[in-house]
């Protein structure tokens, strides 16, 4: 219930709560609430009866935070159970001054996303709330120097590593701030720890997990091909590639680096056991519950099957010797995980498990794919380049000095699909010999006869535009997706790279509207994620001879000097 507070007021309060999060608030209204509010006056909303607060066991401020620790997600439990805006505001203001900053930011973001109280509120881009996580240590040090001398500055930020490391050729992909935001926002929309008791069921969360991360690995493989690198192999519990993030926690030191060829003691054996249990379930077609009986997908025996994905993130993030008391690595934070090459190795491993299930399903027949009466007549026929993106570093320091960083990123010229047909369209692109990724999905009603459709790249439903600066936040719809300006097509090469472009048309009565992979409402597409290319295609004729599917070839060029596009 947000009664008594306008959307503009709630938006302003959330902005103020997240401003200079590592310092005490300077807003009088929040100060007054934090000094006078008593959580003990509303004990019914605290699931643990405030034991952590009473015993002085709140995670301390100026310390690193990990969402994989159940105790460090407890503030969300408080905020999600607030029944009124006043209750939400009182608790947020109170705990902002007393609780760990990382835990507070995470709780605010996820609560605003999932609570009715947060409806309509646009959360500031998290890279401006905690900029040190998204920029390298050199830039942050320059920002502090500028702050100390009260000298405005705009600093250039390079990708990590050197040319001696072949993974550096594709660092622009995993280290892209838009990619980092996409990944962390998706995990906020679909938390792995979500319970239906919070208010609703997250529809098709597991399948969405597969599809979203499959898209990331498919795009990453395509980027590697365009840079003359082999596609990524699945992880085998020796991390072949090392990684040095060159990034610091606000408090707690540098993110730890990992050398090449790190072997995990005992992990390989445990992983093989858990892996074999999951693959055995795939072969039998069912899971087991805690009593050893057949289970629904919502109540498997977690102790038996394990949590491979989450455990792997923790293991890779904490690979150092515990006697050195190092903070978690980048893999333990969804904001930074995609920077580490092992992230894509892990998700290729996860993807292969899902593919094993998909390959066990019967292939689609021509009757499954075809839409009677619909024919795609033609698809008319891209140069990529690097540009810079300005990141505001205002929350990285204390004094009000204009400080920002320029980050290099891949970009492309705006383009359009010209299609003669009808109905719900899906558009896929892949290198001629490897991997596919969805570029767009949209709904279009058609009239009898020929329909000419022009679809602009900026309208793609699987991408989002750049986020607004926190200072410019007024009315901007929150959403998550891969960055429109750089990730919808592949970097390619200066001499060009051939891609196959597929357009498919589906029956809207069977599909539904287009929301793509994000949102907290019921997923509107009833077909499997990635349909019709999600299963094996033993006979290409079934696929290519369907009148509602059209394949064409495009050539993508990369302009090393930037600017012009083909």
Swiss-Prot record:
Hemolymph. It is found in: Secreted, Extracellular space. Cu cation A binds at residues 183, 187, 213. GO terms for cellular component: extracellular region. Disulfide bonds join 82-87. Cu cation B binds at residues 309, 313, 347. GO terms for molecular function: metal ion binding; oxidoreductase activity; oxygen carrier activity. Its main location: secreted. InterPro entries: Di-copper_centre_dom_sf, Hemocyanin/hexamerin, Hemocyanin/hexamerin_mid_dom, Hemocyanin_C, Hemocyanin_C_sf, Hemocyanin_N, Hemocyanin_N_sf, Ig_E-set. Gene3D superfamilies: Di-copper center containing domain from catechol oxidase, Hemocyanin, C-terminal domain, Hemocyanin, N-terminal domain. It comes from the Eukaryota. The keyword Hydrolase does not apply. Transmembrane segments: none annotated. Pfam families: Hemocyanin_C (PF03723), Hemocyanin_M (PF00372), Hemocyanin_N (PF03722). Keywords: Copper, Disulfide bond, Metal-binding, Oxygen transport, Secreted, Transport. Hemocyanins are copper-containing oxygen carriers occurring freely dissolved in the hemolymph of many mollusks and arthropods. Belongs to the tyrosinase family. Hemocyanin subfamily. The B chain contains two copper-binding sites. Three histidine residues are ligands to each copper ion. This is Hemocyanin B chain. It comes from Astacus leptodactylus. The lineage of its organism: Eukaryota, Metazoa, Ecdysozoa, Arthropoda, Crustacea.
